[in-house]
Amino acid sequence: MDVTAEAKQIMVQALGKMYSSRSQRGGLRLHRSLLLTLVMKSARDIYHSARLMSEKSGQSVTEECTSHTQEPMDTSSSTATPLRETSGQSSEDGQRSGLEGHPHPLNPAADKENCGPSRPDRHSRKRRSKTATDSDFIPCKKAKLECAEVRGVLQNSSANCGRALDSLSLVPMPRTIVTF
C-alpha cells in the first residue's frame, strides 16, 4: 500500500473515532493521546519496514522484503528465534561482552531513538530546590533557647498575681487573654 494512501486511511479512521468519542466524558482528550500513540507506532513500523527494504534491496533479496512490508514489525520475542540462537549463544556472548563498555558500538546515528538529549544546553524540567541554588546554607529550624533564657522570658511575661511576699508570686505564670 502506498504511504499516502495509508496516511489518508489513518486520518479518516481518526476523524471517525474523534466524532464518535466526542459525546463521552473526557473522551476527546483521551482519544487524542491514544491516537498520537497509534500514529507514532504505525509511522515507526513503516519507517523500519522501509529501512529493511532498502537494506535488503542492496543485498538483492526480494522475498523477505515483501513479507516485512505486508506485516508490521513485531517487537515481542517469538519462540522460534531462541531455538535457533541457542547454538550460537556462546560465541555471541563473547562478542557482546566486548561491546558492553561502548554505548554506540558501530554507528552512533543509528540509534537516535534511545539516545539522551542531543543538546547539552537543554535544561531539565525538574524543579530545583532552593538549597541547591543558594551557596549560603540557611538552616530551616529555629534555634532552641537555653534553659536560663526560657526562665528569663517566662519571668518577664509573668503576671503579678499576689502580694510581694506571697509564695505564689514566685511561680511564673504566663499571661493569657481570652477573647470571645
UniProtKB/Swiss-Prot annotation:
Cellular component annotations (GO), alphabetically ordered: cytoplasm; nucleus
This protein's UniProt keywords: Cytoplasm, Nucleus
Compositional bias ranges of the Polar residues kind: 56-92
Phenotype of the disrupted gene, per the record: Morpholino knockdown of the protein causes severe deficits in laterality. Partial loss of Kupffer's vesicle cilia with the length of the remaining cilia reduced. Double morpholino knockdown of IER2 and FIBPB causes an almost complete loss of Kupffer's vesicle cilia.
GO BP field: cilium assembly; convergent extension; determination of left/right symmetry; Kupffer's vesicle development
UniProt superkingdom: Eukaryota
InterPro entries xrefs: IER
Biased composition (Basic and acidic residues): 93-103
Subcellular location: Nucleus; Cytoplasm
Function text: DNA-binding protein that seems to act as a transcription factor. Mediates with FIBPB FGF-signaling in Kupffer's vesicle ciliogenesis and in the establishment of laterality in the embryo.
Subunit structure: Interacts with FIBPB.
Family, per entry: Belongs to the IER family.
Protein name per the record: Immediate early response gene 2 protein
The species this protein was found in: Danio rerio
